[in-house]
UniProtKB/Swiss-Prot annotation:
Localisation: Mitochondrion matrix
Keyword entries, A-Z: Disulfide bond, FAD, Flavoprotein, Mitochondrion, NAD, Oxidoreductase, Redox-active center, Transit peptide
Protein induction: Induced by cadmium.
Functional summary from the UniProt entry: Lipoamide dehydrogenase is a component of the glycine decarboxylase (GDC) or glycine cleavage system as well as of the alpha-ketoacid dehydrogenase complexes. LPD1 is probably the protein most often associated with the glycine decarboxylase complex while LPD2 is probably incorporated into alpha-ketoacid dehydrogenase complexes.
Gene: LPD2
PANTHER family: DIHYDROLIPOYL DEHYDROGENASE 2, MITOCHONDRIAL (PTHR22912:SF211), DISULFIDE OXIDOREDUCTASE (PTHR22912)
General remark: The active site is a redox-active disulfide bond.
Annotated protein name in UniProt: Dihydrolipoyl dehydrogenase 2, mitochondrial
Subunit text: Homodimer. Part of both the glycine cleavage system composed of four proteins: P, T, L and H and of the pyruvate dehydrogenase complex containing multiple copies of three enzymatic components: pyruvate dehydrogenase (E1), dihydrolipoamide acetyltransferase (E2) and lipoamide dehydrogenase (E3).
Needed co-factor(s): FAD
SUPFAM superfamilies: FAD/NAD(P)-binding domain, FAD/NAD-linked reductases, dimerisation (C-terminal) domain
Reaction catalysis annotation: N(6)-[(R)-dihydrolipoyl]-L-lysyl-[protein] + NAD(+) = N(6)-[(R)-lipoyl]-L-lysyl-[protein] + NADH + H(+)
Species annotation: Arabidopsis thaliana (Mouse-ear cress)
Length: 507
């Protein structure tokens, strides 16, 4: 790495000035569930409404920075949508369903004979629930360790420095704070004319807890969540049809990778109806009838399924907080408007995560939370939304960071492209997972890496070499000259980097 790059690294860490000073002693005025919540009769330095990834991480970081902190969470369990009914339970089911699929269809190719493979759905769901329970308890343990006050209840603003909380025990308390952070996350976006009952017409929450494997499943929406949940039930035996209004699945994905990805899902018998609009639904019978037509208009078709999953995106959860009472500005979509320091237009009130503009991702919310409380503590905080990775946790996975080829063309940026397929990677061939590729986009003049896109069974783990490289303005040659262990899947990144500025060795 060049000396200039090393200097940038040193400057970066010096300017962050992150402190881990111990917190002040806390005084607890009364006890709620689990015995470590406070009424907040003494002013807090920081009060956080919402205990999801953004909220609980902000709370812990604030306490580590010596700020007296209270976190309010309506669910009664920390972790938000991600931990309770999103990222974590879906990954548990994705893994369990993949294990079943491998045992049924792949083990024999590796000399492992299994006479009978069956799905024990109750046991599979129980494993998922156990994982969630253990992790939520773990976050509570972190709150205790860091002396974060935890109030279980629904909070809404009384003033810019006061939050009224209806606790899960039926009490009402007022929590006061010098700085209040809104971290209430997002909720499922509904579609006109479709009522989610979480039985036959389900959201992602209901799709995580189906008590029977549907023979036919229709997924409305070809985004991350819809494709992941469609994959779970497809592996377990459901006939899956994905209905999408747009012309492509996961529209924000790099086009070349997306085409490969769709072909892979189609090989897994997932069907796609793109450029298709849902115009009606009938769930009065035993199953569900979905009426669709071409997005541009035309002849209607009726689709039948046992279960319909509505996965048409998410909307910020900002209603019911009495934001208008204190004058906090939101946009037309209900997102809270903030500046680069996460401050709203109301002094002392901040917002992070899914309730503000930007990608609705748990890890982005976590970074927001850390940066926000660093600003509050008088330190340097920073989140670069152009360098936040995204992962689709199907099989294979797709992971990306930075710009797509389509974005660079639109912006008029001259770039080089380097690609390397996993079919030429020795580790991938040895373990029979050679599907996919690594694609690197770099500035044509400077060789600075602008985007990296990976399709591979473990793309979500591989992408972080690229995330680090992009955050430190590395070039493709920088990656190419780093020794990678052999044989590993990560060698494909090195080879793609070599292909970007020169030529790969193994192609």
């Amino acid at each position: 790495m060049a000396m200039a790059s090393l200097a940038r690294r040193k400057a970066y860490f010096l300017t962050r000035n992150i402190s881990n000073s111990p917190t002040d002693a806390f005084r607890f005025s009364f006890s709620l569930t689990r015995g470590f919540a406070s009424s907040g009769s003494d002013d807090n330095d920081v009060v956080i409404i919402g205990g999801g990834p953004g909220g609980y991480v902000a709370a812990i970081k604030a306490a580590q920075l010596g700020l007296k902190t209270t976190c309010i969470e309506k669910r009664g369990a920390l972790g938000g949508t991600c931990l309770n009914v999103g990222c974590i339970p879906s990954k548990a089911l994705l893994h369990s369903s993949h294990m079943y699929h491998e045992a049924k269809h792949v083990f024999a190719n590796h000399g492992v004979k299994v006479s009978s493979v069956e799905v024990d759905l109750p046991a599979m769901l129980a494993q998922k629930d156990t994982a969630v329970k253990n992790l939520t308890r773990g976050v509570e343990g972190l709150f205790k360790k860091n002396k974060v006050n935890y109030v279980k209840g629904y909070g809404k603003f009384l003033s810019p420095s006061e939050v009224s909380v209806d606790t899960i025990d039926g009490e009402n308390v007022v929590v006061k704070g010098k700085h209040i952070i809104v971290a209430t996350g997002s909720d499922v976006k509904s579609l006109p004319g479709i009522t989610i009952d979480e039985k036959k017409i389900v959201s992602s929450t209901g799709a995580l807890s189906l008590t029977e494997i549907p023979k036919k499943l229709i997924v409305i929406g070809a985004g991350y969540i819809g494709l992941e949940m469609g994959s779970v039930w497809g592996r377990l035996g459901s006939e899956v049809t994905v209905v999408e209004f747009a012309a492509d699945i996961v529209p924000a994905m790099d086009g070349e990778i997306r085409k490969q990805f769709q072909r892979s899902l189609e090989k897994q018998k997932m069907k796609f109806m793109l450029k298709t609009k849902v115009v009606g639904v009938d769930s009065s019978g035993d199953g569900v009838k979905l009426i669709v037509e071409p997005a541009e208009g035309g002849e209607q078709t009726t689709l039948e399924a046992d279960v319909v999953l509505v996965s048409a995106g998410r909307t910020p959860f900002t209603s019911g907080l009495d934001l208008e009472k204190i004058g906090v500005e939101t946009d037309k979509g209900g997102r809270i408007l903030v500046n680069e320091r996460f401050s709203t237009n109301v002094s002392g009130v901040y917002a992070i995560g899914d309730v503000i503009p930007g990608p609705m991702l748990a890890h982005k919310a976590e970074e927001d939370g850390v940066a926000c409380v660093e600003f509050i503590a008088g330190k340097h905080g920073h989140v670069d939304y152009d360098k936040v990775p995204g992962v689709v946790y199907t099989y294979p996975e797709v992971a990306s960071v930075g710009k797509t080829e389509e974005q660079l063309k639109k912006e008029g940026v001259s770039y080089n492209v380097g690609k390397f397929p996993f079919m030429a990677n020795s580790r991938a061939k040895a373990i029979d997972t050679a599907e996919g590729m690594v694609k690197i986009l770099a500035d044509k003049e400077t060789d600075k890496i602008l985007g990296v896109h990976i399709m591979s069974p473990n793309a979500g783990e591989l992408i972080h070499e690229a995330v680090l490289a992009i955050n430190y303005d590395a070039s493709s040659e920088d990656i190419a000259r780093v020794c990678h262990a052999h044989p590993t899947m990560s060698e494909a990144i090195k080879e793609a980097a070599m292909a970007t500025y020169d030529k790969p060795i193994h192609m």
